[in-house]
Amino acid sequence: MTQMTVQVVTPDGIKYDHQAKFISVETTDGEMGILPRHINLIAPLVIHEMKIRRTDDDNHVDWVAINGGIIEIKDNVVTIVADSAERSRDIDVSRAERAKLRAEREIEAAKSAHDIDEVQRAQVALRRALNRINVGNK
C-alpha cells in the first residue's frame, strides 16, 4: 500500500505524526487534496480543518485544527509547520466557545472605537475559535 508520513509541528512540539493515504488542507489558493507520491510543494496555509485518512483504519478520519502556517511535501513526507494546531480529541470545546464570545465582544468594541487593526486581530481570533469548535465537535 502506498502511504505518506504526515507530521504537524508547532512551537510546542510535534502534534501529529502518522502514516496516511489521504489528507485535505486549505492553502491561500484554496482546498487541496494530497495523495501519496504528490509532487514536491511548499505552500502557505490558512486557518482550517485538516482531514487525514490514516492507513491503519479505513473508516477513521483524524481531524486537526490548523491555525495558519506552511505545508511542505517532499518525497512522501508531508510536514505542516503551524503557529498552533490541535487534534479534535484534544480540544476543549467549552474553552473555544468562551474564546469565540470574547472575540465577538472584542470585534464590537474595536468597531465602536474605529480601531481597524484591533478589528482584524479580533476577527482572526474569532476564526481560530470557530475552527477549534468545528474540529472539536467532530
Curated annotation (Swiss-Prot):
Function according to Swiss-Prot or TrEMBL: Produces ATP from ADP in the presence of a proton gradient across the membrane.
Name of the featured protein: ATP synthase epsilon chain
One GO cellular component term: proton-transporting ATP synthase complex
Membrane topology annotation: Peripheral membrane protein
MF (Gene Ontology): ATP binding; proton-transporting ATP synthase activity, rotational mechanism
Family, per entry: Belongs to the ATPase epsilon chain family.
Record text on subunit structure and interactions: F-type ATPases have 2 components, CF(1) - the catalytic core - and CF(0) - the membrane proton channel. CF(1) has five subunits: alpha(3), beta(3), gamma(1), delta(1), epsilon(1). CF(0) has three main subunits: a, b and c.
UniProt keyword list: ATP synthesis, Cell membrane, CF(1), Hydrogen ion transport, Ion transport, Membrane, Transport
PANTHER family: ATP SYNTHASE DELTA/EPSILON CHAIN (PTHR13822), ATP SYNTHASE EPSILON CHAIN, CHLOROPLASTIC (PTHR13822:SF10)
Upper classification of the organism: Bacteria, Bacillati, Bacillota, Bacilli, Lactobacillales
Signal peptide stretch: none
Subcellular location: Cell membrane
Domain of life where this protein originates: Bacteria
Gene: atpC
InterPro entries: ATP_synth_F1_dsu/esu, ATP_synth_F1_dsu/esu_N, ATP_synth_F1_esu_C, ATPsynth_dsu/esu_N
Keyword Cell membrane: yes
